[in-house]
Each structure stands twice: as structure tokens, then as C-alpha cells.
Amino acid sequence: MTGLLAGRTALVTGGTAGIGRGIAEVLALHGARVAVTGVTEERCAQAREDGLDVYQLDVRDKKACIRVVNDVAAECGGLSVLVANAGVYPQVRLADLDDDQIDFIFDVNVKGMMHVVQAATPALRESGRGRIVVTSSITGNITGYPGWSHYGATKAAQMGFIRSAAMELAGDRITINAVMPGNIMTPGLKALGDDYLAEMAKAVPLGMLGEAKDIGEAVAYLASDGARYVTGQSIVVDGGQILPEGPEALAEM
């Protein structure tokens, strides 16, 4: 434990598994009291067994977001950090996308994010040093991947929201920023198999895939007093994946 976030209470949506779980664990290691949300009772139950403060939440439900944020603030001694991490990323080719799929991903990734930010703002304002960190993606405004046009659109929307929200929240000394993960080793990614993962790693200049804790460390910085003068920005955590020259240039050096 470093004490970087000592005295802080953080809420991580979608924090029962994957990147969100990694973020929650890192924030706790830095001294924060951490509450997480999950959409399914199964994941919530597992996280409770692991000793986390867990709240079941579907971020599409605005009233539920308000209720959960108020519960966290009341039961955990306030709220000073919100990590809007909950999201979905189904792969669907553009030609196969239908309106229901588009509505679903925007309802979760965009409206859901906005719901939790709106719900948390009063408690963050009261804390006197509120921090909001959104888990976005390099597909938001830097690069793209086949099958994720709808996902990339939601992440671009998040970044537009962050920049404008930063202007509105600044008067309350609340900062809002994003982390943009590259290829991060999650259970879903591991399921693709070792050979596929090895090929993915070759596309990263550092020669390896990231881990959820790498995202967590970036979030911890943005949630800390060290980032008090940073707002409306994003940190890319991708091992150099988006660098224009790519690994081929490194091989020639």
C-alpha cells in the first residue's frame, strides 16, 4: 500500500471482473476504500466473497445509478472518486449491425456513463476534490478495428462528453479524464488462445500485452492529488501500439 489514495472512497462501475476489477484492486492497494458494481448477481456474489463492497447495478437505469451512488456515499463515508468503467464490446460487422445492437451499446457505453457521472456529481462536489475517470478506448479517436465500428462510435462519444463536461465541472473542482486501453489481458482475451495472443503481442512495440493493473495504475494517478491540474484529457495505455511507425520500425533499428 502506498497511501497515494488514503482517505479516498472510490466507486468503480463494472468492477467485478476484467479491467474494472483490476482497477479496483490497484486503487485499494493505494489506500482507497473501493466499492464496485456489477450487472449480474453471480459476479456480484463472487466479488463479495473476495471481500469487496459490491452493489448490483445496470447503468442503463438512471434511477438505480442515483440510488447506488447515494448508498455508497452513505455506507462508505462519502465519495471522492468515480471510475465509469462499465461497458460492453460485442464484435459485429458493419453490414450485420441492426438498430437493437446499436441502441444497446450506446445505452450502456454512453448513456450509462452519463448516468453515473450525473448521479455522482453531488457527492464528488461535496468531497472538495472530486475525480472522475472514464475507461474509454484507443478506438475512440485514434484507431479502429474491423467489427467494432459501433463500439468505436461510443468511445468517441465518451471523449466528446469528457471534454465538455470538464468545462462544466471545473467550477466545483471536479476533474474528469479518460484512460484509453490497448490490448489488455482479460479473461475474454485469454479465451482467444495462446497463438492468437502471441500474434497480438507482436503488434505492440513493447512486445507484450498489458494487464488490468496497468490500467489501474493510470487511473490511480488521475484519481490522486498529483493530477489535480489535469482535466478533459486522456492517457493511452497500450504499450506503444498506436505509434505510427509500429514494431517493424523497431526491428530495423
Name these PLM-found stretches.
Residues 117, 154, 162:
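Active-site helix of classical SDR
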Residues 9, 16-18:
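Conserved glycine-rich cofactor-binding loop
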Residues 231-253:
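Short C-terminal tail/terminal secondary-structure segment
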Residues 122, 167-168, 228:
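Alpha-helical segment proximal to the catalytic Tyr-Lys
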Residues 83, 129, 170, 175, ...:
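Short, small/polar-rich loop/turn modules that mediate ligand/substrate recognition or access, typified
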Residues 171, 178, 199-230, 237-239:
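C-terminal helical subdomain
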Residues 93-94, 101-106, 200:
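Substrate-binding pocket helix/loop in short-chain dehydrogenase/reductase
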